[in-house]
Amino acid sequence: MKLNIIILLFCVAASHIAYAKQCQIERLTSSQLNLSSSYLSQAATSFSVACDSNYAIKFNSRNLTNATGSSYLVNEKNYKLRTQMNISGASASRWNSPIAQPATEQNKFVVLVQLMERPTALTPAGVYKDSLYINLMF
């Protein structure tokens, strides 16, 4: 059975015209995470943010179920497998809510995904997906 999570990055700019603020995502280690089909398997990606002013970052996923990072992978037949996502590098591990961050030359973030459901012989084979969205507001 193949399980994967596709990472999509979006930057949202909300800056003033008088001063051109700069904020960018750099050093993305992987745009697609692949989990093995074993219980508690993990996958992670990291990236850095450089901003010349204070900013906010928001993490969300297509299948997010709560603010603590519970989500699920889904296959083409809508069968679901639960996952848990965690953020490190931010001032909080909060999902679907902007997290204020100070201006920095480089702030490293890591998103870790863990399979929280044990696949069995009865688990339908297929490609299981979720999408992660990262928004920068500056």
Positions of the model-derived regions?
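Cleavable N-terminal signal peptides
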Residues: 7-8, 18
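Extended rod-forming repeat segments used as scaffolds/tethers
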Residues: 9-11, 137
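N-terminal signal peptide c-region/cleavage motif recognized by signal peptidases
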Residues: 13-17
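N-terminal small/polar-rich segments of proteins
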Residues: 19-75, 101-138
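Surface-exposed binding patches on compact interaction domains or structured appendages
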Residues: 62-98
